[in-house]
Amino acid sequence: MMSPTPEDDRDLVVVRGRLRMMDSGTETDREQRHPRTTWRSICCGCTIGMVFTIFVLVAAVLLGSLFTVSYMAMESGTCPDEWIGLGYSCMRVAGKNATDLEALDTCARHNSKLIDFANAKVLVEAIAPFGVPNAAYGEVFRLRDSKTTCIRPTMGGPVSADCPVTCTVICQRPRPLSTMSSIIRDARVYLHLERRDYYEVYASVLSNAMSK
């Protein structure tokens, strides 16, 4: 004889799963870790914000310098060996007993040009106070400005003289830029804000102004 089945048993649903017991200590640890995580997130956000702000400021300064800063006002670099630095130019005696064409070719090999009158005047006046004997002033050197008029250095300063067939060659070129000035100049040239030969022309103008 079968036992009767209660009506409530037919409505039962089988439920399978795991029962996990959690003590109150776990909830306490989770509450303690939450403020630490929040504080770390705030610190990380502040650090990223500071780094981004510094980057933006540096970029703004560099971009502003491309348009406003005159790199000619910065400290210039040093002249190469065997070159004399004077003002915004570097000069050197590149040869002797050279004709006009030989003088031009000699300076071209040194990536330079013949000295002009303004720089020749500054050079002679700079070495005159050292009391070099007149014998050292016997050389006549050519000028870029004229093919017929040369310069003869004297204790009293430069004196114009007729150019002989051959004479001394003195070359000049702009003084090298410092590292920072070179970066600014290259950036301006790359952005087509300035011509590549602008510095050479500007240095020549400043040298002429200094000699007056």
From Swiss-Prot:
Keyword annotations for this protein, in alphabetical order, are: Glycoprotein, Membrane, Signal-anchor, Transmembrane, Transmembrane helix, Viral envelope protein, Virion
Q: Which GO terms describe its cellular component?
A: membrane; viral envelope; virion membrane
Intravirion topological intervals: 1-47
Q: Where in the cell is it found?
A: Virion membrane
Q: What is its main location?
A: virion
- Glycosylated residues, per the record, are N97
A Pfam family hit = UL45
Q: Where are the transmembrane segments?
A: 48-68
**Glycoprotein found in the keyword field:** yes
> InterPro entries in the record, alphabetically?
CTDL_fold
Question: Which ranges make up the Virion surface topological domains here?
Answer: 69-212
Its membrane topology: Single-pass type II membrane protein
What are the annotated disulfide bridges?
Answer: none
The record's comment on protein family reads:
Belongs to the herpesviridae HHV-1 UL45 family.
Q: What is this protein called?
A: Envelope protein UL45 homolog
Q: Which organism is it from?
A: Meleagrid herpesvirus 1 (strain H2)
| Organismal lineage | Viruses, Duplodnaviria, Heunggongvirae, Peploviricota, Herviviricetes
